[in-house]
UniProtKB/Swiss-Prot annotation:
Gene3D superfamilies: TolB, C-terminal domain. Residues 1-31 form the signal peptide. GO terms for cellular component: endoplasmic reticulum; vacuole. This is Protein STRICTOSIDINE SYNTHASE-LIKE 8. InterPro entries: 6-blade_b-propeller_TolB-like, Strictosidine_synth_cons-reg. It is found in: Vacuole. Keywords: Glycoprotein, Signal, Vacuole. Belongs to the strictosidine synthase family. It comes from Arabidopsis thaliana (Mouse-ear cress).
Length: 376
């Protein structure tokens, strides 16, 4: 067969066509969307540096102290104010010798979502390698709580929330096949290996309440405890899972987001802040619609390059507030140029009018007065 005919087969032509399109329309392909109604205020946030990367989740203890953050080297750190700074509080693995401040080492663990149980002071930790763990109010080495549900290992515990009245811990297992280090494989491949799990803290029983999800990332319980919201990073869709009342056991689409979601936090008034890792662009849309596009890039490029594409060529910061009842978008806050805030993983609003922001990669957290955007 002539070479000219061989190269025109669908399998061999697709990468060539894709490369040509990328060459001529590069800025249009990776450029992030411009969103209507956004407030460009995140660049005004105060930066609090850390000595290590990746404060992915933030939490405050029952006394209001903190925030506490889980970082790349497997530790949970506590903020003690400007004078004392960040201090060690807990860790998820006893193996500390080879832990890195910049790269995740599986044996060191990777604490992701953090949730304090208010009545006991115990901190529940979703670790991206070991499962769900907890540590007492004094900190130290965390103990394993859940590493299996319905006969399948918890491989990638991501974020959880506690129903204190019912003693139930809800959490995401973003993949029952892959660990945290394979997060972008799970995201780009289109595999439906994520699930939401209900853990009875008294009976010590774990039950799957939603399955076959594409990288369920954030999770939060509604203010009245009647439903759980979880968002899929691969589809930009948030699901509402009813856990009480006449709709218990059913689920529905709660919101469609303008980007790839990470963690979710309920506000003091019952709405939800959702952190977006990046906004949509043509590249992320192509990956969403055609999973072979994601697999192609994943198999031919370095992960850093893929992340660069997903972020539109530059890291930026964006968080979205959803109505706690309808899922309607109420607020969009951005640092579209990434001047201050970037790679956002969580936004946590406190009762004293502060919005704390974490990052899955950057060695910093940020804090913004809610009055800055409420007045706009």
């Amino acid at each position: 067969m002539p070479i000219s005919r061989r190269v025109l087969t669908p399998i061999t032509a697709a990468p060539v066509i894709l490369a040509v399109l990328c060459f001529f329309f590069w800025s249009s392909i990776i450029g992030p969307d411009n969103l209507k109604g956004t407030k460009h205020v995140l660049q005004d946030a105060k930066t609090i540096p850390l000595p290590v990367d990746g404060p992915e989740s933030l939490e405050f203890d029952p006394q209001g102290e903190g925030p506490y953050v889980g970082v790349t080297d497997g530790r949970i750190l506590k903020w003690r104010g400007e004078e004392l700074g960040w201090v060690d509080f807990a860790y998820t693995s006893p193996h500390r010798d080879n832990c890195s401040s910049h790269e995740v080492v599986p044996s060191c663990g990777r604490p992701l979502g953090l949730s304090f149980e208010r009545k006991t002071g115990d901190l529940y930790i979703c670790d991206g390698y070991f499962g769900v763990m907890k540590v007492g109010p004094e900190g130290g080495l965390a103990e394993l709580v859940v590493d299996e549900a319905e006969g399948r290992k918890v491989m990638f515990a991501n974020q959880g929330d506690i129903d204190e009245e019912e003693d139930i811990f809800y959490f995401n297992d973003s993949s029952d096949t892959y660990h945290f280090r394979d997060v972008f494989y799970v995201s780009l491949s289109g595999t439906k290996v994520g699930r939401v799990i209900r853990y009875d803290m008294k009976k010590k029983e774990a039950k799957v309440i939603m399955d076959k999800l594409r990288l369920p990332n954030g999770l939060a319980l509604s203010k009245n405890g009647s439903f759980v919201v979880t968002c899929e990073s691969s589809t930009n869709i948030c699901h509402r899972i009813w856990v009480k009342g006449p709709k218990s056991g059913t689920n529905e689409v709660f919101a469609t987001l303008p980007g790839s979601p990470d963690n979710i936090r309920r506000t003091p008034t019952g709405d939800f802040w959702v952190a977006l890792h990046c906004k949509k662009n043509l590249f992320t849309r192509a990956v969403l619609i055609h999973t072979w596009v994601g697999r192609f890039f994943m198999n031919t490029m370095k992960m850093e390059t893929v992340i660069h594409f997903m972020n539109g060529g530059k890291p930026h910061g964006i968080v979205v507030k959803l109505s706690g009842e309808t899922g309607e978008i109420l607020e969009i806050l951005e640092d579209s140029e990434g001047k201050t805030v970037k790679y956002v993983s969580e936004a946590y609003e406190t009762k004293d009018g502060k919005l704390w922001i974490g990052s899955v990669y950057w060695p910093a957290v940020w804090v913004l007065d809610t009055s800055v955007y409420d007045s706009i």
